[in-house]
Amino acid sequence: MWGFWLLLFWGFSGMYRWGMTTLPTLGQTLGGVNECQDTTTCPAYATCTDTTDSYYCTCKRGFLSSNGQTNFQGPGVECQDVNECLQSDSPCGPNSVCTNILGRAKCSCLRGFSSSTGKDWILGSLDNFLCADVDECLTIGICPKYSNCSNSVGSYSCTCQPGFVLNGSICEDEDECVTRDVCPEHATCHNTLGSYYCTCNSGLESSGGGPMFQGLDESCEDVDECSRNSTLCGPTFICINTLGSYSCSCPAGFSLPTFQILGHPADGNCTDIDECDDTCPLNSSCTNTIGSYFCTCHPGFASSNGQLNFKDLEVTCEDIDECTQDPLQCGLNSVCTNVPGSYICGCLPDFQMDPEGSQGYGNFNCKRILFKCKEDLILQSEQIQQCQAVQGRDLGYASFCTLVNATFTILDNTCENKSAPVSLQSAATSVSLVLEQATTWFELSKEETSTLGTILLETVESTMLAALLIPSGNASQMIQTEYLDIESKVINEECKENESINLAARGDKMNVGCFIIKESVSTGAPGVAFVSFAHMESVLNERFFEDGQSFRKLRMNSRVVGGTVTGEKKEDFSKPIIYTLQHIQPKQKSERPICVSWNTDVEDGRWTPSGCEIVEASETHTVCSCNRMANLAIIMASGELTMEFSLYIISHVGTVISLVCLALAIATFLLCRAVQNHNTYMHLHLCVCLFLAKILFLTGIDKTDNQTACAIIAGFLHYLFLACFFWMLVEAVMLFLMVRNLKVVNYFSSRNIKMLHLCAFGYGLPVLVVIISASVQPRGYGMHNRCWLNTETGFIWSFLGPVCMIITINSVLLAWTLWVLRQKLCSVSSEVSKLKDTRLLTFKAIAQIFILGCSWVLGIFQIGPLASIMAYLFTIINSLQGAFIFLIHCLLNRQVRDEYKKLLTRKTDLSSHSQTSGILLSSMPSTSKMG
């Protein structure tokens, strides 16, 4: 509509302009001046209009005067171009672009739009201008092949068709089989132009039933060919369905000799498989059967499932321990050693295999070795092995090794040529040279003396046996030297059972019945020998005697004698051998003789009374009856009790009293709640440790039969007594802190220490000491005569070391405590210091010496002339330590006595709970809780 008014405006303007130009002409005609004839009267882009007496200028359409007037005159005014595109209402309309030109404006349609004429429009033209959307999709080829064109306002877009993807400016076919997971498992994807399809693999079919499908909604399922066609593999084979296929195979235990194509009917026949190629376990044999097999363990092995024949691959063949099943597998006097699948027989020590006997299965024969050689003795003793190792280079073993080697030289002469006669005279002379080294013998340790004594006795016995087995010209001999006498007899004639053989040497005699000669099963001509040693009783004396009567005075009162017989059997005879031994000194009426034999099984050799009995004893002789050939001596036990026995009685009586008192103290500390506090708990731990240590000491100190159990007992005693001393140290420290707290205000109090920390100290440190001690010297626990720490190797210091340290600390702390207590008592008023409780307090303070173990220092002073007095004091005080604890902490504690009275009289008077100064050293009241 606005275009119409614009045209109308232009029409009137033209008419006006025309009128204005015609009037001047008329004026000129009428005779006036026409200024408009001068073309410079008006500026450029203006029209001049003449009036009757003047003129005026008007800017052309699309221009405005610089002074803003429509009609103007005069110079200086210009007509300036008007930018119609900047007007508020766009002259071109929507979807168009306005371009200003001189005096006018040009309208152009935006990209994607077009006017009705398809051309630009100049403002002022007669026709209307309207930009309409252009549908580019109507243009052929504007989008590439396999794409769709979509028109939009002012534009368009191209989209590839389904199954195609854009590659640059063209649409290419998309291979869905490569770019996407479009088919299910066990299916094959096939690509087509713009699409795809899926087919199941051979032997499978789709769940939808069709041959082709798209997407994952369907799945490929296995076709069971074996169930659809039962004759697929034929009558002799087994059809096995597999995923997507099937196979034909032979039954278990059979195989097809020719190659079988998977999934095809089998040709040929199935043959039996020999499964015995690496099928059965180790130590077994395999037996093949038609279609199967079974395993059987080798002799000496048994299956783990107990079956004779088996097929289970998890079954193993385990070795049979024939030695455990039958202890007599190898026969008498033998040792059975199990090996995989079998066993080995060997002879016991002092026995050897009989070369004349049968060595068949279960018929192994061992006969006794008639005499020992150096190799046999070396194996019996660690002392000798050590001596052989150092070869005399160690000065500490020089004397011992010298005597050992001298004795072995005698034995080597006997053993080197067992078929040659042995000279008893020469051997006796050599033995005398060893025995005459009395000074050297007395310098040896107890273990070395017993070891050397054993070697010497065994050497003499072996020499006598060798002389009897291969006699020289003299069938019976009598050898006399300064240090030993020997009488030997070879019995060439038949010895009747009721007869006996008498041998004598240095006043000692041995009577051997002929029945013993027969029982001994002699090889060749039987023979017996008897030896009596001079001065050997001073070396192998009563200190090597271990017996429960050691509390009586003992002394050796005979020479050491020995007897032997050529037979294999040397002990457990049906009738005894009679030994008559002459006394070195007359027997006293108060003395009782003990017939002892040298036992090499106890340590390296000890005198023991087992196997022999006293038949009769006179002032000059003792007759012994023994059931074996042995080395014997007579030990006299005096009727006078030794100091050790008195100490033994005192120790045991005092220990029993202490146990009773400790039990009462433990019950008091546990059950009397009124006296329970920080200190009584410490007393309780000390009492428990002492109670356990003393009761184990009473019941287990002499349990030496089992060395392993004895070592365990010794280890527990070590720990318990150490725990006692560590708790004594805790008591001493706590007592000192408590007394010092009375003197100094706000001083560190014993109540500030938690009980858990004290328990860790009192029980933990002893464990650490025992573990370290056992690691350093595992054999230090247990001795031959008591279950305690070894006192001969220095191992006892693993106990004495900590004990001495604790005694020293406790003594210093106790002295300091008494000094502080004395200053405290002197500082109070004279009236208070004269109270009777002061005397009680002082007594209880001094009694702490016994409670805290300080009295153990008496054991160190058991030397010199005061040794016996110190021994009695030490035994009495320390055996009654439990009684002292009960006396100080219970009976002399008024609060505890009140609790005892209440318990006995069943009264419940609560007024008796008064505190007195007597509790000061036994149980300081504490309101703090236990840590």
UniProtKB/Swiss-Prot annotation:
Parts of the chain on the Cytoplasmic side: 673-679, 736-754, 822-839, 898-931
The record's tissue-specificity note reads:
In macrophages; but absent from those which are localized within T-cell areas of lymph nodes and spleen. Low level of expression on blood monocytes.
Q: Which cysteines are joined by disulfide bonds?
A: C36-C48, C42-C57, C59-C79, C85-C98, C92-C107, C109-C131, C137-C149, C143-C158, C160-C171, C177-C189, C183-C198, C200-C220, C226-C239, C233-C248, C250-C270, C276-C286, C280-C295, C297-C317, C323-C336, C330-C345, C347-C366, C595-C624, C612-C626
**Keyword Phosphoprotein appears in the UniProt entry:** no
Q: Where are the transmembrane segments?
A: 645-672, 680-701, 712-735, 755-776, 793-821, 840-859, 875-897
Main location class: membrane
- Glycosylation: residue positions: N148, N167, N229, N269, N283, N405, N417, N474, N498, N706
Pfam families per UniProt: 7tm_2 (PF00002), EGF_CA (PF07645), GPS (PF01825)
Report the Gene3D superfamilies cross-referenced here. Answer: 2.60.220.50, Laminin, Rhodopsin 7-helix transmembrane proteins
Stated membrane topology is: Multi-pass membrane protein
Keywords assigned by UniProt? Adaptive immunity, Calcium, Cell membrane, Disulfide bond, EGF-like domain, G-protein coupled receptor, Glycoprotein, Immunity, Membrane, Receptor, Repeat, Signal, Transducer, Transmembrane, Transmembrane helix
InterPro entries associated with the record: EGF-like_Ca-bd_dom, EGF-like_dom, EGF-type_Asp/Asn_hydroxyl_site, EGF_Ca-bd_CS, GAIN_B, GAIN_dom_sf, GPCR_2-like_7TM, GPCR_2_EMR1-like_rcpt
Which compartments is it annotated to reside in? Answer: Cell membrane
Q: Name one GO cellular component term.
A: plasma membrane
Lineage: superkingdom: Eukaryota
Show where the GAIN-B domain sits: 482-642
Provide the GO MF annotations for this entry: calcium ion binding; G protein-coupled receptor activity
Ranges per topology, Extracellular = 28-644, 702-711, 777-792, 860-874
Q: Where is this motif: Cell attachment site?
A: 506-508
Question: In which family does this protein belong, per the annotation?
Answer: Belongs to the G-protein coupled receptor 2 family. Adhesion G-protein coupled receptor (ADGR) subfamily.
User: What name appears for this protein in its UniProt entry?
Assistant: Adhesion G protein-coupled receptor E1
Name its species.
Mus musculus (Mouse)
- From the UniProt record, report the name of the gene that encodes this protein: Adgre1
